[in-house]
Amino acid sequence: MHSRHIILIVAAIAVIALASCHNEKKSEKRSDTSNTTATTTDTTTLTKKKAGTTEPPKQIEADGIDKYFTVAPVSDSLWGIMQNNNIVNRKDLRHIRVLHWDFDNKSHQGEMICHRSIADTLVQIFKELYKAKYPIQRMVLPHLYGNDDEAQMQDNNTSCYCPRTVKGTTVMSKHARGLAVDLNPLYNPYYRAKKDGSLDVQPSTATPFFDREKEFDYKIDHNDLAYKLFTSHGFRWGGDWKTCKDYQHFER
């Protein structure tokens, strides 16, 4: 009987030891998982960040670049802000978020509203521009400028959807349909010769940049990567127009 008690006690100790070892391994796994998730960022967190937020390269690498290039429906809160002369149904618009490099070589969150038919294409184009470190100074939504195109061009804001007419007309712009992008507009202005011989330059502060024979930074021409990417995806460039020139403008 005494020997039997000893055997039972030894068996019990062995079971306790195995259970302890098993729990320790489970604890290690939980610890490893906790450490892994601590270095990544939830996509929902990214979409709540304001456009213009600086993103450290190490964080982008840890998260994975694809998390920063997204397409989503227009949210209720955003639609409430946007409602101003809209001619496109909300269901036909998309909210895209991307990364871009500014002129000081810093990585920022950017965003724009566009038509759903070009949303995935724009995300692809901006991802290629980002990988190439193509400089885009600013990319925020036009309602921050009261949808004033002159104001956002002077601020060199890159944008797509903006509910407005073509300046000087009652014709709705391609931007009002979310089918055109203006890229680094201050350095790539619109201009045309008036009947009196004077020039109409937009933005008005861009007169140093309408002469495309000059060399300067951020100029879009036929050798520019943005031109090549946009046109390869079926966009037309305003710099190729005949009666006027719109070097910032790509449309579908």
PLM region descriptions:
Residues 17-20:
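C-terminal motif of bacterial Sec signal peptides marking the signal peptidase cleavage site
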Residues 30, 42-106:
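N-terminal module-boundary/linker segments of secreted carbohydrate-active enzymes
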Residues 22-24:
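Bacterial signal peptide processing site
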Residues 88-153:
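Active-site acidic/histidine clusters and adjacent loop/turn architecture
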Residues 1-8:
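Bacterial N-terminal signal peptides that target proteins for export
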